[in-house]
């Protein structure tokens, strides 16, 4: 992890003025995280904020900037899941992959710019350990009309 004046991911989040959200129970018959060896697979997290789901359609009422912010909100949820699962974000050795889905109008081709919100935040929090492979696709609908959904896989340090 890149060394800065902020020695932990939690300190970096605080310095950015970001707070991990409260986690509701999964919305179906699944778990939010599944650990296999040193890997943690995270279920998709839709964009939510203090007022609930961040809904919308990119290219039809929602802008790239709206989507970028929604993708960041998804990552905050995923970090909250990881903290609950691992006890501390210090246990994250590296982010391996991010799959980003954007609720997009037909012809909207800027899904990568939207998902940059997720990628940028992960690198801000974890430094080079946050750099990952990625998929960014536009889809015709997401659960609860969410603007963005993010699924991630991370590698963890053994305790």
Which residue ranges define each predicted feature?
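Short, polar/acidic, helix-capping and beta-turn segments at strand->helix junctions
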Residues: 2-159
């Amino acid at each position: 992890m890149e060394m800065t004046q902020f020695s932990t991911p939690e300190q970096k989040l605080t310095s950015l003025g970001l707070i991990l959200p409260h986690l509701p129970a999964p919305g179906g018959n699944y778990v939010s995280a599944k650990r296999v060896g040193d890997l943690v697979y995270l279920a998709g997290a839709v964009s939510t904020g203090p007022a609930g789901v961040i809904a919308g359609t990119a290219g039809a009422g929602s802008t790239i900037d709206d989507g970028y912010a929604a993708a960041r909100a998804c990552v905050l949820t995923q970090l909250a899941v990881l903290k609950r699962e691992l006890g501390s974000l210090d246990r994250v050795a590296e982010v391996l992959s991010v799959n980003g889905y954007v609720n997009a109008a037909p012809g909207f081709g800027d899904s990568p710019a939207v998902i940059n919100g997720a990628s940028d935040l992960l690198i801000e929090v974890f430094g080079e350990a946050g750099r990952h492979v990625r998929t960014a696709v536009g889809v015709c609908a997401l659960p609860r009309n969410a603007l963005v959904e993010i699924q991630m896989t991370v590698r963890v340090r053994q305790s």
